[in-house]
Amino acid sequence: MNPADLPDTLDVAPLTGETGEPCSFGILIKPCRAGRHIGELSVTWLRALVYSHQLVVLRGFDHFASSDSLTRYCATFGEIMMWPYGAVLELVEHANPDDHIFANSYVPLHWDGMYLDTVPEFQLFQCVHAAGDMQGGRTTFSSTNAALRIATPAVRELWARAHGRYQRSVELYSNTVEAPIIGIHPLREFPVIRFCEPPDENDATFLNPSSYSFGGINKDEEEMLLVSLMKTLRDPRVYYAHQWQTGDFVLSDNLSLLHGREQYTHHSGRHLRRVHIHGRPQIANHHLVRSE
């Protein structure tokens, strides 16, 4: 795709944050006329946009009528990271959920694949049906390299000493991970934050939380670590909450962003599809704690 052609065919603008100001990351792309399909856009161009902007929202395009159609498209974007259930995770509220992912609860900030042998580079999301504007369910994103830029030297020094240890058991895995708070992007070498945010400790309704501990710092520094991380990662300069519209298609960089979800109204009909795309080459998860 020739960038010179973009003004006549596509409307490209920065994402807008809570303050009404443009976000420091992310772009919104809309077609200038109806009837244009997502599959008509250059995959090479879209990948380059994710590298440059971390988060790309496509809105107003014709999209995929089924999970099979979505899977075929995603395979052109890169090698799909397959799960026992297949390529596509249907993110819908379950009647009797056994995990917070399938409840209507909030989801704390985290990165995908943190408990698996390989970590996906990209997430592709399709919004099959959006919750109402006042029903919650926004997907939240935090740019960790931007967070590192705005952190004070004292806070950054604290983060540099700390590491998190997380354990989680679900139907598909039961693993332990130990990751430094400040790590290095496994393909591009710039610093990023790897942090799995604990849920609200007073929320007894949160289903199947991970277990958390933090090392490398003094015990009396742990509260400062968590407070500074949660405050900085939600600073409007580095944070974006996406209000879904039916048909939205979102591409995100799993290696430099953290993401989560806001609580949404019970029985709202919120339905997303998610596909993971491997890195080139595949990214081994060196944070897994291997049993001897």
Curated annotation (Swiss-Prot):
EC number annotated for this UniProt entry: 1.14.20.9
Entry's family note: Belongs to the TfdA dioxygenase family.
Name of protein: Tyrosine isonitrile desaturase
Highest classification ranks of the organism: Bacteria, Pseudomonadati, Pseudomonadota, Gammaproteobacteria, Enterobacterales
Annotated Pfam families: TauD (PF02668)
UniProt keyword annotation of Oxidoreductase present: yes
Residues binding Fe cation, per UniProt: 110, 112, 259
UniProt cross-references to InterPro entries, sorted A to Z: AlphaKG_dependent_hydroxylases, TauD-like_sf, TauD/TfdA-like
Keywords: Iron, Metal-binding, Oxidoreductase
Enzyme class of the recorded protein, top EC level: oxidoreductase
CC cofactor: Fe(2+)
Record bears the keyword Cytoplasm: no
A single MF term (Gene Ontology): gamma-butyrobetaine dioxygenase activity
Name of the gene: pvcB
Reactions accelerated catalytically: (2S)-3-(4-hydroxyphenyl)-2-isocyanopropanoate + 2-oxoglutarate + O2 = (2E)-3-(4-hydroxyphenyl)-2-isocyanoprop-2-enoate + succinate + CO2 + H2O
Cofactor note: Binds 1 Fe(2+) per subunit.
Cited function: Catalyzes the 2-oxoglutarate-dependent oxidation of tyrosine isonitrile.
Transmembrane segments: none
Organism: Erwinia amylovora (strain CFBP1430)
